[in-house]
Amino acid sequence: ERIWWLARPLYSRPGNDLRTEHYARHMMARLLEDAETPDGFAWGRDRRELLIRFGWPTHWARSLEQRIRLEPPPILGHEPGPSFWLFPAPILTDPWGDVTEVHWQPDKEGPPARYAPPYAAVGFAPIDRVQFARFRLGDSTLTAAAFDLTPDSVFAMRPADVRLAVARDPRTPVLVGRESPATARGVVTVRSAWRPAVLSLEALGRDTSRAARRRAMTAPDPMGLPPALSDILLFAPADVLPGSWEAALSTVLSAPLVHPEKRVGLYWEMFDQPDSTTTVEIAVTRTSSGSKGDPPYSVGRPWCPLTTASPVRLSWREESGSRPRGVGRSVVLDLRSLPRGRYLITVQISVAGRPRGCSSREVRVAAGEER
């Protein structure tokens, strides 16, 4: 059940059409067992296996060339396309493993099976420019997604419905927030009574059969307890720094990408009442995680790496009673001296010298000509 849940093509659409297609292929295989085949070859286990994996042909083609021999011309079946591999990798993870290593590659070459969603006849593309962030609102969680669809050649020019879906487990109904932006950039939010395990930003063309998505697993909270810190939200700094997530979303960056000639703002929330022994430390560390060309991970993680040398580091001590619980903090970092590459920004709070909570986010410092 978990495998089908993670392989569901779009959480924002009702039902799981991939699983329905799988069952339909099994039924079609039963129907074709004793039927004549268009190409004249007998039905067998090999043909059944191909049908289960790749579907049945929707049309056939034959050669019109003149043939001297008496055997009939070859007939070729054509399955629907474009088709995609929608299962995650790895399909199963160890209980102690890092679930954020799970990823999806719909355009995988030579997949074991394929499915062609009818709503993605023009393509099923990744959304690379996304920034997810989660904030506690009392007993619920607000999840926000800032996005930029301009790198997509279709959605940069054609209208799309953008939806943010959050999922907890296979048995809990998915919650969906919708947005129909006038431009290819925007923000969509959704509120849930639980901490999401999967975040999925999905775009569907309004006048074209094209779909796109960015899906990410969220790291479990340490010891299953509510986090002391929210995710870090990157924003473009202005004259006045934001004091709430609503204000931060008004200038949010649509991707964890920092341009070398610009400063970057960090917004987060602390959910414990600080006292005079509470210390906040921010560090920026070079990292080599991720494959070359892959965008930074789109959602923060509730942990910090081991202490290493950081080119940017700052810390301060909170004043007792200076701010109520849950009020946001904002700082502006100048990363213009850093070379291009991938970095990890961490915000860690300590109480009486002991770590109380941490939040980290991957960012990439872009080259000067990159936009």
Which residue stretches match the model-derived regions?
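Intrinsically disordered, low-complexity terminal regions enriched in Ser/Thr/Pro/Gly
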Residues: 94-371
